[in-house]
């Protein structure tokens, strides 16, 4: 799984970097030719795209390194750091776009040839849609937080390019302030996306539990297993592609230790079949000691 995960995530990062570099060159020409502030906004965003995607590529490769003596749980948290770094990159670009939009709203400048901007924006829109479709496929296969953050970023680019097309079309009819207004709107949306990305990254770094649906599945597997009377103290988190699952099984006092160990192994294998590549730790408790120990919430 790790080899497939690494291959797909690396390809997604390389594709994003290459696409952003190509679009940057196209947008530099379009901005120089038209003077459109909306295209300038898209140009700045492409610069951020390159920085963010390069960061993703480097960090993802680091996160795929196996566990070592100093990092017993692996390097998967590096993906969350990459997503957090992306949110900072994007917030900076959003602030720049917002300030630029205000400046051009106060002093609008007519574009020299909106038609060139329209052609460039359509090309950028098509390329970005293709990239987002590939990234969405990779996310479905890997659940990579870094690629998901990159995908959300490029999804905002799709909306940006659509808004730029509208702005250029309105500028054709003399609505020159429309260009600046759309730049302001784009800046606000990008900032919202950045804050959402940053929140998700911080939650991962703080070891947020797995989604409720996955925890319910784990509970269902465990409590339905023959020889298991109950379960408690389920603890879960995720680091990169690896889920970490810990749970206490409740078993009859009279069950021999060897048999209890065998049941726990079977439960572990059942969980791994459902969630391949997970790190599972199971503790066995006699039913008689559970009330004295006290139970934490199952969905912890």
Curated annotation (Swiss-Prot):
It catalyses: Zn(2+)(in) + H(+)(out) = Zn(2+)(out) + H(+)(in); Cd(2+)(in) + H(+)(out) = Cd(2+)(out) + H(+)(in); Fe(2+)(in) + H(+)(out) = Fe(2+)(out) + H(+)(in). GO terms for biological process: intracellular zinc ion homeostasis. Homodimer. GO terms for molecular function: cadmium ion transmembrane transporter activity; ferrous iron transmembrane transporter activity; metal ion binding; zinc efflux antiporter activity. Belongs to the cation diffusion facilitator (CDF) transporter (TC 2.A.4) family. FieF subfamily. It is found in: Cell inner membrane. The gene is fieF. This is Cation-efflux pump FieF. The chain crosses the membrane at residues 12-32, 39-59, 82-102, 114-134, 156-176, 178-198.
């Amino acid at each position: 799984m790790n080899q497939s995960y690494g291959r797909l995530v690396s390809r997604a990062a390389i594709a994003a970097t290459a696409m952003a570099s190509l679009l940057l060159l196209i947008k530099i020409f379009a901005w120089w030719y038209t003077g459109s502030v909306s295209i300038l906004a898209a140009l700045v965003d492409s610069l951020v795209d390159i920085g963010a995607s390069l960061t993703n590529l480097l960090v993802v490769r680091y996160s795929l390194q196996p566990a070592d003596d100093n990092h017993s749980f692996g390097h998967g948290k590096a993906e969350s750091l990459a997503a957090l770094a992306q949110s900072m990159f994007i917030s900076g670009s959003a602030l720049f776009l917002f300030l630029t939009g205000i400046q051009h709203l106060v002093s609008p400048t007519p574009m020299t040839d909106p038609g060139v901007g329209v052609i460039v924006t359509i090309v950028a829109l098509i390329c970005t849609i293709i990239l987002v479709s590939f990234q969405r496929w990779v996310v479905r296969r890997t659940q990579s937080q870094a690629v998901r953050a990159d995908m959300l970023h490029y999804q905002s680019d799709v909306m940006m390019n659509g808004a730029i097309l509208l702005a250029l079309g309105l500028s054709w009819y003399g609505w020159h302030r429309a260009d600046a207004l759309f730049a302001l709107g784009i800046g606000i949306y990008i900032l919202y996306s950045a804050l959402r990305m940053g929140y998700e990254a911080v939650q991962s770094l703080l070891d947020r539990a797995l989604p409720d649906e996955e925890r319910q599945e784990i509970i269902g597997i465990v409590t339905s297993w023959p020889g298991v009377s109950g379960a408690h103290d389920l603890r879960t988190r995720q680091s990169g592609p690896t889920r970490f699952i810990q749970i206490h099984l409740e078993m009859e006092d009279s069950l021999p230790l060897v048999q209890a160990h065998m049941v726990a192994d079977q439960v572990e294998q059942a969980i791994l079949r459902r969630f391949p590549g997970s790190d599972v730790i199971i503790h066995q408790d006699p039913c008689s000691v559970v009330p004295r120990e006290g139970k934490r919430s199952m969905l912890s």
